[in-house]
Regions:
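NAD(P)+-binding Rossmann beta1-loop-alpha1 motif at the extreme N-terminus of oxidoreductases
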Residues: 1-66, 92
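Rossmann-fold NAD(P) dinucleotide-binding segment
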Residues: 54-118
């Protein structure tokens, strides 16, 4: 069993909300962030916790799942000012599930590994 069942979902559109709801059904604590206020309200209505910033959303989470639109958004969410890498603990698992070019996915993974993430 996973000791820390706190998982962050960044991007609460159709895919992200589906993932968040599935995690909630399996008794995970789900923290989320999205630029759309309605998506945040929907997460809270389902039993999740919405945070006002990416950094606040990832703090204390054992994993973060990124489900945004493209590589530009992934870059901002992970590596931008107050992005996920600034708030995640070393060793946290990062699952990048956005549609991005293969070269970007490889580079992104390498950067995350160098910073101590799985």
């Amino acid at each position: 069993m996973i000791a820390n069942r706190k998982i962050c979902v960044l991007g609460l559109g159709s895919m992200g909300m589906g993932v968040a709801l599935s995690l909630l059904e399996r008794q995970f604590e789900v923290i989320g962030f999205d630029i759309n206020d309605n998506a945040m309200k929907n997460l809270e209505s389902a039993g999740g916790v919405a945070k006002s910033s990416i950094r606040a959303a990832v703090e204390g989470c054992s994993a973060v799942i990124v489900l945004v639109v493209n590589d530009k958004q992934v870059e901002e969410v992970l590596f931008g000012k107050d992005g996920a890498v600034e708030g995640l603990s070393s060793g946290a698992v990062v699952v990048q599930s956005s549609t991005v070019p293969a070269a970007y996915a490889k580079t992104c993974g390498e950067r995350l590994l160098k910073q101590g993430f799985e």
